[in-house]
Amino acid sequence: VGRDYNAEAQIFDHHQRPNPLRDDEQPYSSFGLIWAQYGRAYLTAMNVPTENIEAIHDNFDSKFVLPIDLLDNGAMEPSVAGPLSILTLSALLGSLKPVFDSTSETDDDDAFMAALPIARSFIEASIGNFAAKARAQSLVLEAIEKAGASPILELPMGMPYRSALDQAGADHILFVVTPRGDDWTI
């Protein structure tokens, strides 16, 4: 892409010197630059509620995009994953690249098109999980308010609740109960 980064021209290369940096001085990869430019619009297109877009954007950026940026820029070594390093998303997608002695003129494009739906499924699943956690947070905070001073928190279904308890400072909650079929779980 010409070793240039120009969001207005939709050029998102990160190989120029100095390379584009985040506010905290960590380097962007092309994926990070694209996410920074279009991530919020992507979340809107995925029907993430407006009030959750910033939090989910930042969460996805720090937990999904940043590690890819760091690996792509050599700021983090894949070996930090130990024997699982060949199973990182970057390594798995990289395994779809053409082999060194391939002579097909379309191999790079074919590999990209093979990787695209795989990457998309992980991106959308991750965002979906962050959005579900935000919905759970809201439900748990409502249940905490409804419970008042009771040491028992009743939730309408199983869901993540620990971060909402911490956020609300609900140290008085000793038990969390949720329905499971005709029974309850504690």
Regions found by a protein language model. Give the residues of each.
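RNase H-like (RuvC/DEDD) metal-dependent nuclease/polynucleotide-processing core
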Residues: K63-A149, M159-Y161
